[in-house]
């Protein structure tokens, strides 16, 4: 029996979404304060995370996994776009210039652990990252472009989904796919729980970046920008 997983994920992660938006790094980002050094570290972190996720989901999709396979839309993949952004920020030798941070390593380890022990839970990770990127990508791209004085595509390919010309239609199809996965309510609950864990793993990456951001803009400005809590402006955008 199919369960309404899409709405359960949306409603069940609202609190975590708001908490993520209120981390210091994201709060400053949404207000247009973006430090390039911190941002490029985030791009590197995301590269390691998406590489792990796309390797595991691709493997499970290729073997016909009944739950993970259907959500593994290749047009969502971000690894190639992140490689282009890393080449912009670090140069063509970017592979030798980046290293995984402790928070990103913990995130990657969790992805591999879930893939090995309970692959269905990868759906929670997939939803948290990809649909968040697709829903808020253009807004975040515009903020980053203006804050770092970048060209139209310079270092911002991550936010571009060229293989998805109709984002609204894609998200409708994605929601329908979630709702038709062959899972029961107990598994749906576990997937929502894992999606919340994914939000917290993202928050750890953001919090890890705050030291660099404070060094760049100063404690006083950082405190001013982060003293008010946001209500969760992008919650309703997710699938």
Task: For every predicted segment, state its role.
Residues 1-239:
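Metal- and O2-centered redox machinery and metal/ROS homeostasis
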């Amino acid at each position: 029996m199919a369960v309404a997983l899409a709405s359960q994920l949306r409603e069940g992660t609202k609190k975590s979404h708001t908490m993520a938006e209120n981390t210091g790094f994201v709060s400053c980002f949404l207000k247009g304060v973006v430090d390039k050094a911190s941002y490029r570290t985030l791009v590197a972190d995301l590269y390691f995370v998406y590489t792990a996720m796309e390797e595991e989901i691709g493997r499970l999709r290729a073997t016909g996994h009944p739950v993970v396979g259907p959500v593994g839309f290749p047009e969502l993949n971000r690894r190639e776009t992140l490689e282009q952004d890393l080449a912009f920020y670090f140069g063509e030798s970017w592979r030798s210039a980046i290293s995984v941070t402790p928070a990103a390593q913990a995130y990657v380890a969790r992805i591999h652990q879930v893939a090995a022990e309970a692959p269905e839970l990868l759906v929670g990770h997939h939803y948290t990252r990809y649909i968040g990127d697709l829903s808020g990508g253009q807004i975040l791209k515009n903020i980053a472009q203006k804050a770092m004085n970048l060209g139209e595509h310079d270092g911002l390919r991550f936010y571009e989904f060229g293989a998805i010309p109709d984002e609204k239609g894609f998200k409708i199809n994605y929601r329908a796919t979630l709702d038709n996965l062959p899972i029961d309510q107990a598994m749906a609950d576990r997937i929502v729980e894992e999606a919340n864990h994914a939000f917290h793993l993202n928050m750890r990456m953001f919090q890890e970046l705050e030291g660099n951001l404070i060094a760049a803009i100063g404690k006083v400005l950082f405190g001013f920008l982060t003293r008010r809590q946001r209500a969760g402006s992008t919650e309703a955008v997710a699938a």
